[in-house]
């Protein structure tokens, strides 16, 4: 199993938290100190927690489980989509729609509509419509693809969520908690770790840090899938106990 090391995290700026006045006391035990009124995250605590999360994800992937990537803020979206696609994982990179997990039946109907429109666009149906109707359907297709394109092949609820910026994605975490879906999350010094089963204390804004998290997670999924033939399947019910306190 490949692991992230301290040098990788330092180069990516994982240790830089938020301004001290915005800190969340629940993250106090992961803070090393402050520099120029910026909290510094204790990477000696982050390192084993990050690697534990990667090991968990690799085991899930080995058991053919689905890990959904969630990162909808501007600095994360593109990286989330790229790495999820590389790992063949579902993702949400634009906006979390309320009920995406807890009302999946309705979401599935919207995914069917998206697939129908994709078929119509490809088979020439749009060309047979009036300009106005074709434009309306094209806009519907674009809107649905933007919202649901990353999960259209998911085929059911995910077995775990990996979240960048737990405050920004609090609705997703709440839905996962209600359904008993494990949550892995990058938690910065201004955020609450509540509802996160596998906490990764770290910078959730810097692009290089986000790239490190996403690339490492995608690599773990790919490794797990490649080891399916020689390993024992591991299911979500057998996951380790939550790390959150």
From Swiss-Prot:
PANTHER family reported for this sequence: 30S RIBOSOMAL PROTEIN S2 PROKARYOTIC AND ORGANELLAR, SMALL RIBOSOMAL SUBUNIT PROTEIN US2M
Superkingdom of origin organism: Bacteria
UniProt xrefs under InterPro entries: Ribosomal_uS2, Ribosomal_uS2_bac/mit/plastid, Ribosomal_uS2_CS, Ribosomal_uS2_flav_dom_sf
Keywords, ordered alphabetically: Ribonucleoprotein, Ribosomal protein
Ribosomal protein in keyword set: yes
Gene Ontology annotations of biological process type: translation
Pfam families on file: Ribosomal_S2 (PF00318)
Gene Ontology molecular functions: structural constituent of ribosome
Record family assignment: Belongs to the universal ribosomal protein uS2 family.
Protein name, UniProt field: Small ribosomal subunit protein uS2
GO cellular component assignments: cytosolic small ribosomal subunit
């Amino acid at each position: 199993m490949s692991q992230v090391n301290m040098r990788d995290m330092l180069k990516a700026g994982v240790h830089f938290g938020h301004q001290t006045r915005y800190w969340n006391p629940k993250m106090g035990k992961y803070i090393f100190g402050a520099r120029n009124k910026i909290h510094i995250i204790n990477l000696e605590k982050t390192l084993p927690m990050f690697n534990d999360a990667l090991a968990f994800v690799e085991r899930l992937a080995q058991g053919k489980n689905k890990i959904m990537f969630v990162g909808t803020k501007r600095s994360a979206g593109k990286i989330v989509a790229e790495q999820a696609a590389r790992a063949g994982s579902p993702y949400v990179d634009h906006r979390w729609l309320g009920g995406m997990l807890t009302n999946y039946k309705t979401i599935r109907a919207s995914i069917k509509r998206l697939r129908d429109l994709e078929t119509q666009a490809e088979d020439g149906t749009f060309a047979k419509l009036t300009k106005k109707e074709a434009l309306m359907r094209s806009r519907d297709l674009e809107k649905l693809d933007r919202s649901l394109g990353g999960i259209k092949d998911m085929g059911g609820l995910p077995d775990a969520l990996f979240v960048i910026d737990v405050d920004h994605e609090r609705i997703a975490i709440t839905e996962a908690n209600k359904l008993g879906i494990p949550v892995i999350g990058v938690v910065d010094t201004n955020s609450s770790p509540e509802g996160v089963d596998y906490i990764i204390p770290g910078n959730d804004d810097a692009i290089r840090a986000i790239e490190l998290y996403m690339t490492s997670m995608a690599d773990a999924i790919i490794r797990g899938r490649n080891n399916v033939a020689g390993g024992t399947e591991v299911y979500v019910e057998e996951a380790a106990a939550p790390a959150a306190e």
